[in-house]
Amino acid sequence: GTRAQDIACNLGLPEPLRRTVIDAARWHDLGKVDPRFQAMLFGGDPIRAELADEPLAKSGMPPGDRQRYIRARTLSKLPRGARHEAWSEALVAEHLSGMPEEYPGDPELLCHLIASHHGHARPLLPPVADNGKHVLTATVDGKEVTTPLPIGVRLSDADRFARLNAR
């Protein structure tokens, strides 16, 4: 958040756009709280993930160790191709829909920045075969937000992408 704030200020972005960029930076990894994702980050160990003081953002696995990653993903039961960005976007969309006042930034751009921060969601996130039905919970601006999983392909994301590109 702080780095994004500095960049947004140095670029002279207007306040609503600045707010959007800062919030996207703060919230883009919310979906990593998924228990399967956390287990994967802990090398496939759900017990270590559950006992952790706070969720990990990175695994610490060597980036080139593909076999270790595949083993961790398999042990964690994280679906192949799962995207934490989809979960982050869903949590933020739920947060926005529950706000008592209108979001002070650009809600469509916010959701798109979150969904696309690893290069996907242009216009759609890839489909994932996810049989893990559960509810994902995260804290956004001090409020608990939930979203049901799995999240399917949302064609409305392509419409949003088109609207953003038409601006």
PLM feature spans:
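Accessory helical-bundle/CTD segments and flexible terminal tails appended to RecA-like ATPase motors
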Residues: 1-5
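Divalent metal-dependent catalytic cores for phosphoryl transfer on phosphate-bearing substrates
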Residues: 12-167
